[in-house]
Amino acid sequence: MSRQWLFSTNHKDIGTLYFIFGAWAGMVGTSLSILIRAELGHPGAFIGDDQIYNVIVTAHAFIMIFFMVMPIMIGGFGNWLVPLMLGAPDMAFPRMNNMSFWMLPPSLTLLISSSMVENGAGTGWTVYPPLSSGIAHAGASVDLAIFSLHLAGISSILGAVNFITTVINMRAPGITLDRMPLFVWSVVITAVLLLLSLPVLAGAITMLLTDRNLNTSFFDPAGGGEPNLYQHLFWFFGHPEVYILILPGFGMISHIITQESGKKETFGNLGMIYAMLAIGLLGFIVWAHHMFTVGMDVDTRAYFTSATMIIAVPTGIKIFSWLATMHGTQLTYSPAMLWAFGFVFLFTVGGLTGVVLANSSIDIVLHDTYYVVAHFHYVLSMGAVFAIMAGFIHWYPLLTGLTMNPNWLKLQFAMMFVGVNLTFFPQHFLGLAGMPRRYSDFPDSYLAWNIVSSLGSTISLFAILYFLFIIWESMITQRTPAFPMQLSSSIEWYHTLPPAEHTYAELPLLTNNF
């Protein structure tokens, strides 16, 4: 047991560990979100003061981003599928792969500890000084959160190096870069973004650590520092990070739509690759659109507004290519396809509110209101999460060799779809009416939509529990699939379900008939 799970060098076992860890962290993060909506479901205090509320909000963000979405998408799906899709026997650095995973549980432990000592880190996930300085947040909480981020960051950097090396060196003969599956492309682009952005975050939080403990003043004006420098460094990481969260989802959705539509390949395959490359590149030159309210020159604001809007172009290319892939087919309303439909529609809605927020003059008004919360939850809670659900259902027979009950899955999709939309759509109205983020209480005029939002979160919770029940049911009944339902979009299906522990003992050769 310990050889298989603690010291594993097998990409499938490590991928499974990532899935289990991500699911567990996801349940913690979901519980925190339920606490947030319970607090906001009625006026007046419920859980406590704003410090504990902001600790919950901060932990919710960190856990969902660093311990749920990234481990599942990059660690889980990436580890499982990239070697299988490349025809590689394993990852390039199998032991480093294991270390990448085992840095996450200590990291999560540090983060949870940070909320249990002193007053907790109630800084928001951005950890801006001076709120995160040694004066406003005395005690060890923020320091523990910083160490947690360092560990998670090292884990991601090592994983990124591993994926990049694997994709460069371990492709089977015949898999040229232009014929590499879109999911593999999405993971390698994500890995490059991680490699370039995380060191900047590490620098920023290390400077914050020394400001708090070693009497430096990088971000303290009293010592000649500049609090704004932190924001620039943080968002230079923070904006690529949001593309890191969604790009593997793009790759998965491309595979699912192509395969379920019965098409030979995705519409505009090469264009899809260039679109992802463009999104990755542009993601690095738009960071200050998170900072329109800090007082930038009008020409700077004009540049960041324009550059941000340009990102909508490659994103639009991807949306329309997905629609073109579905075009002309007899649509199958299979569970995975339903999630993919939901992804395309809701991600588009989230993208449109993003284009609204890109306008610096409008953003001055909407900054730090619930409009922003609604925007990024549409692209995360209904983009990244829907992609994870679609991918998990689609590749579940490959991962486990079992099938889930498709009718139950459709019901579960309907519950989740209603739940998340009921939760986040009203938040657009709250934001337009001026309700600010990160406050535990609000004027009574905002009550009605907050009640609707909290009701939606309860429905989402039951949908998640139902999904766990569906997985449990499939595992105790042990229904095995006879064969994959459609022509496969990639070579990972040319194995037993589930694949043998070691695949591609003899390297495959891909011919033009592929």
From Swiss-Prot:
Pathway: Energy metabolism; oxidative phosphorylation
Enzyme type, top EC level: translocase
Transmembrane segments: 16-36, 55-75, 101-121, 144-164, 182-202, 233-253, 267-287, 304-324, 337-357, 379-399, 413-433, 451-471
Residues at which O2 binds: 243
One GO term (biological process): electron transport coupled proton transport
Keyword check for Disulfide bond: no
Cofactor note: Binds 2 heme A groups non-covalently per subunit. Binds a copper B center.
Binding site for Ca(2+): 39, 44
Required co-factors: heme; Cu cation
Placement of covalent cross-link 1'-histidyl-3'-tyrosine (His-Tyr): 239-243
One GO cellular component term noted in the UniProt record for this chain: mitochondrial inner membrane
Binding site for heme a3: 375
Membrane topology: Multi-pass membrane protein
Record EC number: 7.1.1.9
Reported function: Component of the cytochrome c oxidase, the last enzyme in the mitochondrial electron transport chain which drives oxidative phosphorylation. The respiratory chain contains 3 multisubunit complexes succinate dehydrogenase (complex II, CII), ubiquinol-cytochrome c oxidoreductase (cytochrome b-c1 complex, complex III, CIII) and cytochrome c oxidase (complex IV, CIV), that cooperate to transfer electrons derived from NADH and succinate to molecular oxygen, creating an electrochemical gradient over the inner membrane that drives transmembrane transport and the ATP synthase.
Assembly notes: Component of the cytochrome c oxidase (complex IV, CIV), a multisubunit enzyme composed of a catalytic core of 3 subunits and several supernumerary subunits. The complex exists as a monomer or a dimer and forms supercomplexes (SCs) in the inner mitochondrial membrane with ubiquinol-cytochrome c oxidoreductase (cytochrome b-c1 complex, complex III, CIII).
Protein's UniProt name: Cytochrome c oxidase subunit 1
Source organism per UniProt: Anopheles quadrimaculatus (Common malaria mosquito)
